[in-house]
């Protein structure tokens, strides 16, 4: 009896042990699954029961100031052949495709024979070609659709707009600097799916079909861009130059109306061009402006009361500063004679582009005062000109100790050597002369506009901010008084009418401008005796400035190249186009004029 009780009790204990052991294991497993692996299992279940839907979002269109598209998204097709699945002979297939793809029949046949599948016979084919192939319904031919950025004006706007790579990411120009504003973010929508992977009931969510019709509108005027490109392309061809650029600026707002370089590149096929073409050098590369900086120096001397409007200076033809002899227009012959020009008033100094006269004028300013004025203009090693482009524009100037310790530094700076800046910076300084003495910030992006051409956002540090004012705040600094700039503008008109800028004279129209010819630095140090930069800066019309036009030509190679006979004709051609495009009437009676170049 006792044995039976003990045996029964043992069985009860065993059952309880097994029960508690099983319960413990079950609770442990539940704890492991619910607590330790809970997040992982939840995500796994979510991934099995839902799907994240998104669609490709195109880049916003870039257009000029009049809404003309300059960069748009289109569809393109990669065309693949799979001979393994052909129902016809390779010869027949090649005959059907050759005329559409503009490829040789024999070439296509060889491709089909060498491989059995996955042959790319066309890359980024346009939609009209794809439609022709689809219409033929050829088995074994596959079309893979993908977005493509299309630039309808090719080289014309490449330096401004830039290009995108195969991943649709901006690599240069505004495509790069405005990447975040141009590339729309694709919305992610979570939707439930069944066991077969099909959407449950609701179908495709409406959020995926939201469209953005906004356009990134520039200040560029396509008509002026065309005229500028044709003029500079013809200009560098005639003088056999390395490269050239043209900038047209609104002197009151800072809006860039045209910016071109030649030679340029086609952003549709950017990979066919040398990489140095992708650099927007008018905004990045430094050069010594030469005589085009003389009007700026004249304004400094007038504003600082160092000279007066009716002052005269003696131009002895050459002047020695320390160990250096400075002459007038001495770029090709070191033995250039010191021709005496007698006494010149300040207008004659500018009109004749007298280096010696400019040295005498700036000698009336103490070097440290002169240096401070140059810094006021936004020039210096640590001063940057911010633009809408990817890289900042900067300048180069000797440090104040070197500038004030050596007389030669202020002397060569008086005629535009010894300091360096970008073409866009020089255009900004001429805008300052044009608008009454204000330094304004050049810009090229106007804002985001809708299909009714109404501005919605203004660009703020290359990102569109809905909270800031739609009216662009002009960033300007007062440097010169209107009375000073008025005197300089009159002098610039005389340069065109009866001076070195006479190649830009147009009967009936009042134009102001200045030629420039500067030596480039030699690799071994000092200045080159062979390589120069020529330039021409113009203000039109001079009595009511609306346009600042700058042309710079790098390394012209015709005999006796100067700004007057290389860059001058480029600017003249652009002004003629401006008159035609904008229907600008003459402002003075027609005058006869005899051209000459200095």
UniProtKB/Swiss-Prot annotation:
Q: Where is the active site?
A: 291 (acyl-ester intermediate)
Task: Tell me which EC number(s) this protein carries.
Answer: 3.4.16.4
Which is a Gene Ontology cellular component entry for this protein? plasma membrane
Reactions catalysed, as given in the entry: Preferential cleavage: (Ac)2-L-Lys-D-Ala-|-D-Ala. Also transpeptidation of peptidyl-alanyl moieties that are N-acyl substituents of D-alanine
Entry keywords, A to Z: Carboxypeptidase, Cell shape, Chloroplast, Hydrolase, Membrane, Peptidoglycan synthesis, Plastid, Protease, Transmembrane, Transmembrane helix
User: Coiled-coil segments, which residues?
Assistant: none
Q: Where are the transmembrane segments?
A: 12-33
- Tell me the superkingdom of the source: Eukaryota
Membrane topology of this protein: Single-pass membrane protein
Q: Where found in the cell?
A: Plastid, Chloroplast membrane
EC primary class:
hydrolase
One Gene Ontology term of the biological-process aspect is: cell wall organization
Q: Name one GO molecular function term.
A: serine-type D-Ala-D-Ala carboxypeptidase activity
Q: Which family does it belong to?
A: Belongs to the transpeptidase family.
General remark? The presence of this gene in the chloroplast genome suggests there may be an unsuspected vestigal peptidoglycan layer in this organism's chloroplasts.
Q: What is this protein called?
A: Peptidoglycan D,D-transpeptidase FtsI homolog
């Amino acid at each position: 009896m006792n044995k039976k009780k003990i045996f029964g009790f043992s069985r009860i204990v065993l059952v309880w042990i097994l029960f508690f052991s099983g319960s413990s294991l079950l609770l442990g497993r539940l704890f492991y699954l619910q607590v330790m692996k809970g997040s992982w299992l939840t995500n796994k279940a979510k991934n099995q029961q839902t799907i994240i839907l998104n669609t490709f979002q195109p880049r916003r269109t870039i257009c000029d100031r009049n809404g003309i598209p300059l960069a748009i998204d289109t569809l393109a097709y990669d065309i693949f052949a799979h001979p393994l699945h052909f129902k016809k002979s390779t010869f027949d297939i090649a005959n059907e495709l050759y005329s559409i793809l503009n490829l040789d029949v024999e070439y296509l046949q060889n491709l089909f024979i060498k491989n059995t599948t996955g042959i790319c016979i066309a890359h980024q084919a346009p939609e009209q070609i794809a439609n022709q192939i689809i219409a033929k319904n050829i088995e074994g031919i596959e079309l893979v659709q993908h977005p493509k950025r299309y630039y309808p004006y090719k080289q014309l706007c490449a330096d401004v707009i830039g290009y995108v790579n195969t991943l649709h990411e901006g690599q240069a120009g505004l495509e790069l600097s405005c990447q975040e504003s141009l590339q729309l973010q694709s919305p992610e929508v979570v939707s439930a799916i069944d066991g077969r992977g099909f959407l449950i009931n609701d179908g495709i969510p409406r959020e995926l079909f939201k469209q953005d019709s906004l356009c990134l509108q520039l200040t560029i005027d396509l008509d002026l861009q065309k005229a500028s490109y044709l003029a500079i392309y013809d200009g560098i061809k005639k003088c056999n130059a390395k490269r050239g650029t043209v900038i047209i600026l609104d002197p009151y707002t800072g809006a860039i109306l045209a910016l071109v370089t030649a030679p340029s590149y086609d952003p549709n096929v950017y990979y066919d061009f040398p990489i140095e073409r992708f650099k927007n050098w008018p905004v990045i590369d430094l050069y010594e402006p030469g005589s085009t900086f003389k009007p700026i120096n004249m304004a400094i001397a007038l504003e600082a009361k160092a000279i007066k409007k009716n002052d005269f200076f003696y131009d002895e033809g050459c002047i020695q500063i320390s160990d250096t002899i400075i002459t007038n227009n001495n770029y090709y012959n070191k033995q250039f004679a010191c021709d005496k020009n007698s006494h010149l008033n300040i207008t004659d100094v500018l009109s004749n582009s007298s280096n010696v006269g400019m040295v005498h004028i700036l000698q009336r300013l103490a070097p440290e005062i002169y240096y401070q004025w140059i810094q006021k203009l936004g020039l210096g090693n640590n001063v940057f000109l911010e633009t809408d482009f990817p890289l900042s524009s900067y300048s180069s100037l000797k440090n104040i100790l070197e500038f004030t310790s050596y007389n030669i530094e202020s002397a060569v700076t008086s005629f535009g050597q010894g300091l360096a800046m970008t073409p866009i910076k020089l255009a900004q300084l001429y805008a300052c002369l044009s608008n009454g003495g204000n330094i304004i910030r050049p810009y090229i992006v106007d804002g985001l506009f809708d299909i009714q051409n109404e501005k919605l956002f203004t660009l703020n540090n290359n990102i569109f901010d809905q909270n800031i004012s739609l009216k662009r705040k002009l960033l300007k600094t007062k440097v010169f008084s209107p009375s000073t700039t008025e005197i300089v503008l009159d002098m610039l008109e005389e340069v065109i009418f009866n001076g070195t800028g006479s190649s830009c004279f147009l009967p009936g129209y009042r134009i102001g401008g200045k030629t420039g010819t500067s030596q480039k630095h030699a690799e071994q140090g000092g200045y080159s005796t062979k390589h120069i930069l020529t330039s021409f800066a113009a203000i039109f019309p001079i009595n009511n400035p609306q346009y600042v036009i700058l042309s710079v030509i790098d390394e012209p190679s015709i005999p006796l190249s100067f700004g007057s006979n290389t860059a001058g004709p480029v600017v003249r051609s652009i002004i003629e186009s401006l008159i035609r495009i904008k229907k600008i009437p003459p402002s003075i009676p027609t005058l006869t004029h005899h051209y000459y170049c200095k």
